[in-house]
Amino acid sequence: MTKLEISKPKFGELTQIASDLYWAHFELPFRLNHVNLFLMDTPSGILILDAGLKSDHSEEHWEALINGPLKSKKFAGLLITHYHPDHIGMAGWLQDKLNIKCYTSEKELFTAKTFRSMPDDKYADIFRNVFVRAGMSCLLYTSDAADD
């Protein structure tokens, strides 16, 4: 295996990691503090791999890329790898902004639609149960303890 000597891209920049593959690094406003997005140069144009979290910061980052290193590029589409909000959140914005199609698997589309239509507390219960089954403590925080 060859170790690549590459630097993390800064805001509004792309890092080329192969002849036809580029890396974008978007900050996130929570503990998982970033998401890596990739762009592939194809014969049909740039294929965006994942969209980023729906946020003002992501929109500003995409605007900087679109008006900067991607300014003269044609876009082939958007491929969403999985339903997590930090990967699918900006999909609609990118589709509208770039007039491109979005591609994902039926399973990921179904999962995204299911979770999006679910109340926040139900969504939280599902993930709490997943983490507890994986060995996490059931009680992570109680608001009563904050007053002590």
Give residue ranges: language-model regions.
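A short beta-to-alpha transition loop/helix N-cap that caps and shapes the active-site region
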Residues: 110-115
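Active-site metal-binding motif and surrounding structural segment of the metallo-beta-lactamase
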Residues: 57-109
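Extended, charge-rich helix/loop segments that form flexible
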Residues: 126-140
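Conserved beta-strand hairpin/beta-sheet module of binuclear metal-dependent hydrolase folds
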Residues: 11-73
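Short glycine- and acidic-rich boundary segments immediately preceding or forming the N-terminal edge
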Residues: 2-14
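Short, hinge-like loop/turn segments at secondary-structure boundaries
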Residues: 118-123
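Conserved small/polar residues in nucleotide/adenosyl-binding loops
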Residues: 141-146
